């Protein structure tokens, strides 16, 4: 018999990501001034103290009410999809847990300080990528996993139709 929900695993992932996100942001906010930076891997990775009161690339800067409302809607939708569409699917449940943790991590920042602490500063193939944080990474990985799960599901359905 297969497990319908992997609640323990999902909660563990979400709690770990949120704690790791908040601890790293706290360390940056309390030990570095905004704009301070140090090189970790030359020409690739810096730790740079930055604040963002918008979304990626500063989109919708200062629109906190919008972010509060949309984040609450997203968190509720993720719980709904977890319950309705991720049954028996550990991979999808992990993806949703990562999305939930990422959204919650940045939501906590916005509620407490009105801005998000960003600090991971990368230069990828000469492109100075926008500074981000652990919550952003969790969101990105969650989206990638959901895309993989959906593509895999579509592929499995096509295989069944052929048989």
Curated annotation (Swiss-Prot):
Keyword Transmembrane: yes
Residue ranges crossing the lipid bilayer per the database entry: 11-31, 63-83, 88-108, 131-151
Record bears the keyword Lipid metabolism: no
Primary subcellular site in the record, as a coarse category: membrane
EC numbers on record: 3.4.23.36
Metabolic or biological pathway, per its Swiss-Prot or TrEMBL entry: Protein modification; lipoprotein biosynthesis (signal peptide cleavage)
Record's catalysed reaction(s): Release of signal peptides from bacterial membrane prolipoproteins. Hydrolyzes -Xaa-Yaa-Zaa-|-(S,diacylglyceryl)Cys-, in which Xaa is hydrophobic (preferably Leu), and Yaa (Ala or Ser) and Zaa (Gly or Ala) have small, neutral side chains
Localisation: Cell membrane
Pfam families in alphabetical order: Peptidase_A8
Active site: 118, 136
GO BP term (any one): proteolysis
GO cellular component term of the entry, any: plasma membrane
Keywords, comma-separated and alphabetical: Aspartyl protease, Cell membrane, Hydrolase, Membrane, Protease, Transmembrane, Transmembrane helix
Entry function: This protein specifically catalyzes the removal of signal peptides from prolipoproteins.
Protein name: Lipoprotein signal peptidase
Protein's organism: Staphylococcus aureus (strain MRSA252)
Organism phylogeny: Bacteria, Bacillati, Bacillota, Bacilli, Bacillales
